[in-house]
Regions:
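Membrane-embedded alpha-helical bundles of multi-pass transporters/translocases
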Residues: 2-363
Length: 363
């Protein structure tokens, strides 16, 4: 075993973060777009879509502890946790595409069954991949400073993935839909994301090493572990905070999509985007016009007829990019703010500002 103070190479830290970036291509797509994909593209009713989303989450709550036991009892020449990243990479990519593919000519019942099965498979693969990955950092190094750096790299990668998913998914869907078939647009876009996920998972597998062998002779019962957790008040607070945080993310993602696509003034959005040269009728010639067209950020359609245009897709994506950019900026400023004002003060202030912003969005 290496000395605990050994520094990890940059490549390994960056490679470690790649798998979490890949996981967020699925996670953020679910948070921001999955409900609306099922209702607006796949053709399910709102109640059917809700059921399709509910059952895999309930299954996930049952499967996660099972996956934890499986990962802990895995022993291969690659280690305990790295193999799961390799084993799930290919199936993850395939199911990711299938989950956003709309079969043609199927009855509503068959579509509901297909959506439920593919979504459940995707959630299962997510757990099989992400739970071992979450434990991987603890066996790469025992140096607390190096673990902190690993988490920093991981956090940066997550925000980059969120930036890409939130900012480019809808414009690419509209681009590949070619003005009419959003089912095809979603399938092509998710194929691109799936291939990227596959590459990122392989990067993590081939650039990391498990150096620390977990202690295997510790005896504990699940019942006692759970009882200990319930007595741990900081853990309970963090659990509730995380629960509400992700609930808000889910509500906000679906609500913003619905607002911009079904309620917001499309002419007002068009005029604002036209001022930035992002419409077909913009008089200005942009240096990066070809790139804007390539990523789907050019609004198609005339101002007088925006019913089938991609104006809402582009506007929604710009809002997502703006929000993620602010998040990344705050992350970069957080260490200096924490040193000056203290971690608790900065955290409480951040939560308060986030609450105010959440209310302001729906004012």
């Amino acid at each position: 075993m290496k000395q605990l103070s050994d520094k990890l190479p940059f490549l390994e830290k960056a490679g470690y973060s790649a798998a979490d970036a890949a996981a967020n291509f699925v996670f953020m797509t679910m948070i921001l777009f999955q409900l609306n994909f099922y209702t607006d593209v796949f053709g399910l009713s709102a109640s059917a879509a809700a059921a399709v989303l509910l059952w895999p989450r309930l299954w996930d709550a049952v499967f996660d502890p099972i996956m934890g036991v499986l990962a802990d009892r895995t022993n291969t020449r690659w280690g305990k946790f790295r193999p799961w990243i390799l084993w799930t990479a290919g199936p993850w990519a395939v199911v990711m595409v299938l989950a956003y593919t709309t079969p043609e000519g199927w009855s509503s019942g068959m579509l509901i069954a297909y959506a439920t099965i593919t979504n459940m498979l995707l959630m299962t693969l997510y757990s099989m991949n992400n739970m071992p990955y979450s434990a991987l950092g603890g066996v790469i190094t025992a140096d607390l400073n190096e673990r902190a750096k690993l988490n920093s790299f991981r956090f940066i990668a997550v925000n980059i993935a969120q930036f890409i998913v939130g900012g480019f998914t809808l414009p690419l869907v509209a681009k590949f839909a070619m003005g009419h078939d959003r089912r095809h647009g979603w399938q092509v876009t998710m194929t691109i994301w799936a291939v990227l996920c596959l590459v990122l998972f392989l990067v993590t597998f081939f650039t990391t090493r498990e150096r620390i062998k977990p202690v295997s002779d510790v005896k504990s019962s699940p019942k006692q572990d759970f009882a200990d957790l319930l007595k741990n008040s900081p853990w309970i607070v963090m659990f509730l905070m995380t629960l509400f945080h992700f609930a808000i993310l889910s509500f906000r993602g679906g609500a913003l999509y619905n607002y911009y696509h079904h309620y917001a003034d499309k002419v007002a959005m068009y005029d604002l985007l036209d001022g930035f040269g992002l419409t077909e009728t913009s008089g200005s010639v942009q240096a990066g016009a070809s790139f804007v067209d390539f990523i789907g950020y050019r609004v198609h359609g005339a101002r007088a007829d925006l019913g089938n245009s991609n104006v809402a897709d582009v506007f929604n994506s710009i809002i997502n990019i703006t929000g993620t950019s602010v998040t990344i900026t705050v992350i970069l400023l957080s260490p200096s703010l924490a040193r000056r004002f203290g971690k608790k003060a900065v955290a409480v202030t951040g939560f308060a500002l986030s609450a105010v912003n959440s209310f302001a969005i729906y004012w």
